[in-house]
């Protein structure tokens, strides 16, 4: 199908490598959380939210592994939990309590103005064009819904949150499983064929297509290179410009 033939009621977008540079997450957000975990935990140690996060972190099997590497029995305090959170980040373990902690740290950073969410220049323009055409825009990312909203609310292009109608994270299912996209379509109240999913990951595009969605791959700077098999299986665009004239069916 040619790009000019595409139509949709909902545009479902991935974040990393699609609306936002992969380097923003790995080079800005993750280091910020690592650098500020100790201070955040110290300041909020007595709050119910932080107590819950600490309890969930210390119940992880990875915590048992981590504690066994220490020379002495650890005291559960802010510094120790901050060290454990850095251990998880360095191992790229995206466990739920860590994502919750990171989300709280990022929220503080966004609120103070230290952090601004990266979006590509064409994203805000396309979002506005799709919204003006009556299309809904939804987000599906492995990052928590709270973290998603922060990126778009505090973006370098301004507050894009009013243009977004729904957010999905791994609570709906993993991104390479077809059932996740079926659930998303049901939640949106549309047939899967009326959803256009934009992602940089071929395995996600394949899962969405198997659910009946239309899919387009993004070849943004810094993204993993696409193989000939991928480029023959899916339409590929360098940015959202070619999709700005998308209309409803």
From Swiss-Prot:
Family, according to the entry, reads as follows: Belongs to the HAD-like hydrolase superfamily. MasA/MtnC family.
Q: What is this protein called?
A: Enolase-phosphatase E1
A GO BP entry: L-methionine salvage from methylthioadenosine
Listed binding positions for Mg(2+) are 14, 16, 200
Q: What is its EC number?
A: 3.1.3.77
Q: Where in the cell is it found?
A: Cytoplasm; Nucleus
Q: Which reaction does it catalyse?
A: 5-methylsulfanyl-2,3-dioxopentyl phosphate + H2O = 1,2-dihydroxy-5-(methylsulfanyl)pent-1-en-3-one + phosphate
Keyword annotations for this protein, in alphabetical order, are: Amino-acid biosynthesis, Cytoplasm, Hydrolase, Magnesium, Metal-binding, Methionine biosynthesis, Nucleus
- Binding locations of substrate: 141-142, 175
Q: In which pathway does it act?
A: Amino-acid biosynthesis; L-methionine biosynthesis via salvage pathway; L-methionine from S-methyl-5-thio-alpha-D-ribose 1-phosphate: step 3/6; Amino-acid biosynthesis; L-methionine biosynthesis via salvage pathway; L-methionine from S-methyl-5-thio-alpha-D-ribose 1-phosphate: step 4/6
Q: Which cofactor does it need?
A: Mg(2+)
Keyword presence, Nucleus? yes
Q: Which HAMAP family match?
A: Salvage_MtnC, Salvage_MtnC_euk
The entry's function note states:
Bifunctional enzyme that catalyzes the enolization of 2,3-diketo-5-methylthiopentyl-1-phosphate (DK-MTP-1-P) into the intermediate 2-hydroxy-3-keto-5-methylthiopentenyl-1-phosphate (HK-MTPenyl-1-P), which is then dephosphorylated to form the acireductone 1,2-dihydroxy-3-keto-5-methylthiopentene (DHK-MTPene).
Q: What is its main location?
A: cytoplasm
Is Lipoprotein among the key words of this record? Answer: no
Pfam families reported in the protein's UniProt record: Hydrolase (PF00702)
Cofactor binding, note field: Binds 1 Mg(2+) ion per subunit.
GO terms assigned for molecular function: acireductone synthase activity; magnesium ion binding
Q: How does it assemble?
A: Monomer.
User: Its GO CC terms?
Assistant: cytoplasm; nucleus
